[in-house]
């Protein structure tokens, strides 16, 4: 609100009488999964406590085009001033929830139980909200940041001098119950990681044939697997069929199209 309103909404204040009371409704203009209603409501609570915001659906619900998702009443100035920020929350987060749900639906076509994960590829200061939207769409949150799980990537491995050295250093420093995951790009790296022992192996940019081989090796050692890299709606079902436990998708948060949602004054 500080960023958008600044010293005041000079357009609304010039045109709308201060004592004008109005009503409005927020409508979904396309089918999708809703997320962000609490933030939209909070926008108006902070802006003007006289505004009444009533959610007509819940976050995580699928709506059709034309569905009224919220009704607003109160000072007209406040309704108009908060419109853009409230819609920004709803459109962006509902877009993430909707895309996540599409990936979940595609991956569910196979018998294997697989979880769709988000990543750290989020907008600065939006991570909590964007990961919440992923959950609303049926996805599962990966680590929240660099502090709650160890994920050894290719650059860590390069600096450490190899997978074995990187894993051993991580194991020596890791606190109890902190998950240790390592990235592997080829079968030889998978075998090396299995030999040393980790909680999960991230199978990065592997083709389907290699994924199947890697998953089979990991299952024998009871190590969880996560497929990542190049995942899209066309290939996610095939990736799920390999038997991986998780599929992480950066596009959920960095490439989701905003859901078309509008606020209409009554």
Question: Where is each model-derived feature located?
Answer:
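Cys/His-rich Zn2+-binding cysteine-cluster or related metal-binding knuckle/ribbon modules and their
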Residues: 233
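Active-site loop ensemble at the mouth of alpha/beta enzyme cores that anchors a bound cofactor
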Residues: 262-266
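Acidic/glycine-rich phosphate/pyrophosphate-binding loops and surrounding catalytic core
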Residues: 1-185, 189-196, 200, 209-217, ...
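Short secondary-structure boundary segments
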Residues: 205, 229, 251-252
């Amino acid at each position: 609100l500080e960023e958008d309103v600044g010293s005041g909404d000079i357009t609304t204040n010039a045109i709308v009488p201060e004592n004008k009371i109005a009503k409005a409704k927020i409508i979904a203009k396309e089918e999708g999964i809703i997320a962000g209603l609490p933030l939209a409501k909070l926008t108006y609570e902070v802006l003007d406590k006289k505004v009444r915001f009533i959610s007509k659906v819940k976050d995580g619900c699928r709506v059709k085009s034309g569905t009224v998702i919220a009704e607003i009443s109160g000072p007209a100035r406040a309704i108009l001033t908060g419109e853009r920020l409230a819609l920004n929350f709803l459109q962006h987060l509902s877009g993430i929830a909707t895309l996540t749900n599409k990936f979940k639906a595609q991956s569910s076509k196979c018998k294997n139980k697989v979880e769709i994960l988000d990543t750290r590829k989020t907008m600065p200061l939006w991570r909590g909200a964007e990961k919440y939207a992923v959950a609303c769409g049926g996805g599962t949150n990966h680590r929240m940041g660099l502090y709650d799980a160890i994920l050894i990537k290719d650059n860590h491995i390069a600096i450490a001098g190899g997978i074995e050295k990187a894993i051993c250093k991580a194991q020596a420093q890791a606190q109890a119950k902190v998950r240790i995951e390592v990235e592997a790009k080829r079968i030889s790296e998978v075998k090396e990681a299995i030999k040393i022992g980790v909680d999960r192996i991230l199978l990065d940019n592997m083709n389907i044939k290699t994924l199947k081989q890697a998953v089979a090796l990991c299952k024998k050692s009871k190590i969880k697997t996560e497929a990542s890299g190049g995942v899209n709606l066309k290939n996610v079902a095939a990736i799920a069929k390999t038997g991986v436990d998780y599929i992480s998708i950066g596009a959920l948060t960095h490439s989701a199209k905003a859901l078309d949602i509008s606020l209409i004054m009554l």
